[in-house]
Design a protein with these regions (language model features):
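N-terminal secretory signal peptides and thylakoid transit peptides that target proteins
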Residues: 1-17
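A short, N-terminal "cap"/entry segment at the start of jelly-roll beta-barrel domains
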Residues: 22, 27-87, 185-271, 277, ...
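Histidine-centered metal-chelating micro-motifs
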Residues: 95-97, 116, 136-137, 141-146, ...
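Mobile, glycine-rich extracellular loop/lid and propeptide segments
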Residues: 97, 107-110, 116-119, 128, ...
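Short histidine-centered beta-strand/loop micro-motifs
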Residues: 97-101, 128-129, 148-149, 277-282, ...
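Glycine- and acidic-residue-biased ligand/ion/polar-headgroup-sensing regions
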Residues: 102-122, 281-302
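Short acidic-glycine-tyrosine-enriched beta hairpin
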Residues: 122-138, 302-318
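Ligand-binding loop in jelly-roll beta-barrel domains
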Residues: 141-167, 321-347
Length: 392
């Protein structure tokens, strides 16, 4: 062994030793990001790839009145350790009460109706925003917030959390806390008689129900203290990030929406027969929700493992970080998907682009083909292909 080789060997050996220590003492657990890169995830380590599909909108979820929250966590979809999602509908006058998520940031996309949110941060800033279909919000992990339906018609939105376990030990609601805190403690905290809390709810309300909110929100007790970074981004009000023969994509990460440090969101439209071509994401898991249409999603998991799932409107899919995949519209009308990544900076490696970037002799040897064959391959990243192949 030469000296540089020996040095590399020693560094690698030290890495294996520390990995063994880690895996020997600690199974992969919620909030432990190490499982994504180092410790094999038992859910995805079997001979066959597990299912990566869950029929979210067909599930029952939590229903109060005409409002609901349906969730996809590791309980419903065991492979989805990095990201959880919720479909939530609020009836007019309903509010998802003041709460926070101890172990997840919240990213959302509005499908129908209008929503108002107020979010409060540790610097003492609060922002109240109104949202329309196509708009996005992001609340950093642990920041207090509420969501309420505006107007006389229901609203429907999809929430994405950067932790697949978030539901089990993640949601802290204000009524749950106040309802269980001793009255003398509440009296001292707020400078009120204990009796002031007699008729407060005793248990978590979750969906509070009241009047339809005013056109303009009423002023908080301490007035408005607006944060330096907004929590709202109007995704579909922008032109698409990329337009191709076969489809188009809108994308927002922290480069355009600075507060969104841990989530990237995408709206992917595919024409019939269109394909988001074979690719992987080096730095993030991918969570998919079909807004409309029928798609076929493939997953490549190494060691010959390959799995295909068909997703339709209301279904959820999940692609682990670094796994190869593709999405094809197999219906006869356009498809639209909401896709979330647990990263603030979007990255992709597309197979077409990787091939185009390698020396021809490498490709020839690798595939046992004449080098001239590869001249016919695309000389660029395809990203989205149309029904009859890559556009110009
Ligand atoms: Mn929330
Ligand atoms: Mn992808």
């Amino acid at each position: 062994m030469s000296d540089p080789q020996r040095r590399e060997f020693l560094v690698a050996a030290a890495g294996i030793a520390s990995l063994a220590t880690l895996s020997g003492t600690q199974p992969a657990a919620a909030g432990d990001p190490s499982f994504m890169n180092n410790v094999p995830d038992p859910v995805a380590a079997g001979k066959e790839l597990p299912t990566f599909k869950f029929a979210l909108e067909k599930s029952e979820g939590k229903v109060i009145g005409n409002s609901f929250g349906k969730e996809a966590t590791v309980t419903q979809l065991p492979i989805s350790k990095g990201i959880a999602g919720v479909s939530m509908k609020l009836e007019p006058g309903a509010m998802r009460e003041l709460h926070w998520h101890a172990t997840a940031a919240e990213w959302a996309f509005v499908l129908e109706g209008r929503v108002r949110t107020t979010v409060f941060d540790p610097a003492g800033y609060a922002e109240t925003n109104d949202f329309e279909p196509g708009d996005v919000w992001y609340f950093p992990r642990g920041h207090g917030h509420m969501l309420e339906c505006l107007d006389n018609k229901p609203c429907h939105f999809i929430l994405i959390f950067d932790n697949g376990y978030f539901s089990e030990f993640g949601t802290f609601s204000i009524t749950d806390w106040v309802g269980h805190a001793p009255k003398p403690l509440l009296a001292k905290t707020f400078g009120l008689p204990e009796s002031a809390f007699d008729s407060f709810p005793k248990d978590e309300v979750y969906f509070a129900r009241g009047k339809i909110p005013p056109t303009e929100p009423s002023v908080p007790l301490e007035g408005w203290k607006l944060p330096p970074e907004t929590h709202r981004y109007r995704l579909l009000a922008q032109p698409p990030h990329g337009t191709f023969q076969g489809g188009r994509e809108w994308r927002v990460d922290s480069t355009r929406f600075p507060i969104s440090k841990t989530v990237t969101g995408v709206i992917l439209d595919l024409d019939p027969g269109g394909v988001r071509t074979l690719h992987w994401h080096p730095n993030a898991n991918e969570w998919q929700y079909v807004i409309d249409g029928d798609v076929s999603v493939t997953l490549f998991g190494s060691h010959g493992r390959f799995r295909t799932e068909q997703l339709s409107k209301g279904d959820v899919g999940y692609i682990p970080q670094g796994y190869g995949h593709s999405i094809e519209n197999i219906g006869n009308r356009p498809s639209r998907m909401l896709i979330g990544f647990n990263t603030g900076v979007y990255q992709t490696i597309d197979l077409s682009n990787w091939i185009a970037a390698n020396p021809l002799d490498v490709l020839a040897t690798n595939f046992s083909q004449p080098p001239e064959l590869f001249e016919k391959f695309p000389h660029r990243d395809v990203f989205i292909a149309a029904k009859d192949g890559p556009g110009k």
